[in-house]
């Protein structure tokens, strides 16, 4: 079986030689490694007659629908009002066209399973990482050279791909297409994006060293990236993170309101970020989404959204309430189109955080007339929790003492993490109590069902085991929980926990079966009952593989041995039939 299916991401041509993935002994075809990291690389230019157009897609066999190409075209250029002269980097996210064949199979699914929930791929979306250049050029009719180099990927590794673009884009604009081919060939030599391993990624003479987090990592910690087999002299740069943004820089214009913003994101409230450029809008939206980590933000979010987006009508209609989505916009038109939205964040030009904004009060929505309105948060929302003055003082003190922005971001990240954990721990504790006891698991009965989630029962647990055990914040925690239980973020979190616990029950049931003397059981029962048992056990093995059940390898081997021993005790004609119906 190939390492992964060759579909939209990159199909090897017939007759091309396969290499082997040394650790797994699986065949690797050209562009398989590339497809693990990127879907494709696009160059978007400006044509006087056509407007924005995709000039190059690499590798050439990469598949994009016309709708996807149109979205990429408009999202890869700043709105004309942004006035982005020079080089600008930003990020966007867009829906994949429906009915597309998935390009990844079991191995990459396995990698995805080891990631923290907030880094798992969403198969319905692509990310676009943009390096846009606009410089004066009198030789061109328009008077400007305008072009974007865009990396399209399913992976939300913002910092990694931003770093890659910073390395390759300036040289690409000088050397053009042959250079792009060399870049893609380099990526096709990268190891798979295995969580938890130290990876060395060469790109045009530079070697990046990084580590992708795993779900086993303690939240809020970044394990030290240590050298494995590669000498220090060969490492050009070490990336401390693959996905994090500069939190403090993003929240600096509105940091008096960070706790309220955390509540709005947690509750999946409709939020729009109005910013002067795609760089500011995309970084702020990504910072908002990350502020409830390690919870996954389960609604849609668009770091940069334009009036040409295929979902423009869906998201701006006034015939229904605004959807649970976070939009980053720069076009002044949105100040009017989205003025019915309940929560609007206005971001000014992001400078290095040397000045603390003086504005403290939340502004009323009716005061937001245009995109030129003063920076601030425009909403009538009343937070459930009392304001934490300590974090504001701590950050203000950091500004006065000229504390590095990295340190300020670390303080802010730790604050958000502790707030989110204080909120989610009571829910985790209650949901864990819905799991049946191990003694209730019988090998001869179907695995027991999880108990039903009762909002009333959960609320009763908060009096003695609520967030007050880990947080000193006062306020209406009960009201916050009631609101959260109706949100898409709760729905996504609970579905994930349900799936995880159901798989644990299936795994425990499988272990219980393995601990039985199944051969002895078969000797006491009819041939029909024994054949039925064999088929059920084989289905259990298939389920364990298909659903990636958390079963030890020894348990699976033991079950295979049981199946084989039972079959060999049957008459020859039945042995032949059962041995042909799958591996025993």
UniProtKB/Swiss-Prot annotation:
Instruction: Please name the GO terms that the record assigns under molecular function.
Output: guanyl-nucleotide exchange factor activity
Its job: Guanine nucleotide exchange factor (GEF) for RAB14.
Question: What's a Pfam family this protein contains?
Answer: Avl9
Q: Which UniProt keywords apply?
A: Cytoplasm, Endosome, Guanine-nucleotide releasing factor
Region of interest (Disordered), ranges? 1-23
Q: Which residues form the dDENN domain?
A: 371-504
The UniProt entry's sequence similarity note says: Belongs to the DENND6 family.
Grouped into one coarse class, the protein's main location is other
User: Superkingdom, according to UniProt?
Assistant: Eukaryota
**One Gene Ontology cellular component annotation?**
recycling endosome
Q: Which residues form the uDENN domain?
A: 39-218
Stretches assigned to the cDENN domain: 244-369
Official protein name in the record: Protein DENND6A
């Amino acid at each position: 079986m190939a390492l992964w299916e060759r579909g939209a991401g990159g199909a090897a041509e017939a007759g091309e030689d396969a290499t082997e993935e040394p650790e797994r002994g699986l065949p690797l075809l050209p562009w398989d490694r590339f497809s693990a990291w990127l879907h494709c690389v696009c160059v978007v230019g400006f044509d006087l007659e056509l407007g924005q157009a995709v000039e190059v897609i690499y590798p050439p066999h990469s598949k994009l629908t016309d709708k996807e190409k149109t979205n990429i075209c408009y999202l890869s250029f700043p709105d004309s009002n942004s006035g982005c002269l020079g080089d600008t980097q930003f990020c966007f996210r867009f829906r994949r066209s429906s009915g597309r064949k998935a390009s990844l199979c079991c191995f990459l699914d396995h990698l995805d399973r080891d990631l923290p929930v907030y880094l798992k791929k969403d198969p319905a979306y692509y990310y676009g990482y943009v390096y846009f250049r606009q410089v004066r050029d009198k030789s061109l009719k328009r008077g400007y050279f305008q072009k974007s180099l865009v990396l399209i990927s399913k992976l939300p590794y913002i910092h990694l791909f931003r770093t890659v673009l910073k390395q390759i884009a300036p040289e690409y604009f000088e050397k053009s297409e042959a250079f792009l081919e060399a870049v893609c060939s380099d990526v096709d030599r990268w190891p798979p994006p295995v969580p938890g391993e130290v990876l060395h990624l060469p790109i045009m003479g530079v070697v990046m060293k990084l580590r992708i987090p795993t779900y086993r990592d303690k939240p809020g910690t970044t394990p030290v990236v240590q050298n494995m087999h590669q000498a220090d002299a060969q490492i050009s740069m070490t990336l401390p993170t693959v996905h994090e943004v500069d939190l403090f820089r993003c929240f600096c214009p509105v940091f008096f309101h960070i706790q309220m913003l955390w509540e709005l994101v947690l509750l999946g409230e409709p939020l729009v970020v109005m910013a002067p450029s795609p760089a500011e809008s995309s970084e702020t939206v990504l910072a908002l989404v990350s502020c409830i980590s390690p919870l996954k933000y389960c609604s849609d979010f668009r770091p940069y959204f334009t009036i040409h987006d295929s979902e423009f009508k869906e998201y701006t209609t006034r015939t229904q309430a605004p959807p649970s989505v976070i939009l980053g916009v720069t076009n002044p038109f949105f100040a009017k189109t989205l003025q019915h939205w309940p929560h609007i964040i206005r971001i000014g030009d992001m400078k290095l955080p040397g000045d603390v904004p003086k504005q403290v009060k939340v502004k009323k929505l009716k005061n937001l007339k245009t995109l030129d309105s003063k920076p601030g948060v425009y909403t009538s929302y009343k937070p459930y929790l009392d304001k934490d003055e300590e974090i504001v003082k701590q950050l203000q003190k950091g500004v006065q003492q000229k504390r590095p922005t990295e340190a300020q971001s670390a303080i802010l990240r730790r604050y958000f993490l502790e707030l989110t954990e204080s909120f989610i721990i009571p829910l985790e504790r209650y949901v864990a109590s819905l799991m049946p006891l191990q003694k209730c698991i019988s090998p001869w009965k179907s695995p027991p069902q999880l108990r039903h989630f009762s909002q009333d029962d959960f609320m009763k647990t908060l009096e003695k085991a609520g967030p007050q055990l880990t947080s000193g914040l006062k306020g209406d925690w009960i009201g916050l929980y009631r609101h959260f239980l109706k949100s898409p973020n709760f729905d996504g979190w609970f579905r994930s926990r349900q799936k995880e616990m159901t798989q644990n029950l299936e795994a425990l049931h499988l272990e219980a079966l393995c601990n039985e003397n199944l051969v002895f059981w078969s000797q006491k029962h009819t041939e029909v009952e024994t054949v039925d048992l064999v088929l059920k056990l084989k289905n259990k093995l298939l389920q364990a593989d298909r659903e990636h059940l958390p079963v030890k390898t020894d348990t699976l081997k033991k079950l295979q041995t049981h199946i084989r021993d039972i079959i060999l005790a049957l008459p020859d004609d039945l042995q032949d039939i059962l041995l042909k119906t799958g591996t025993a």
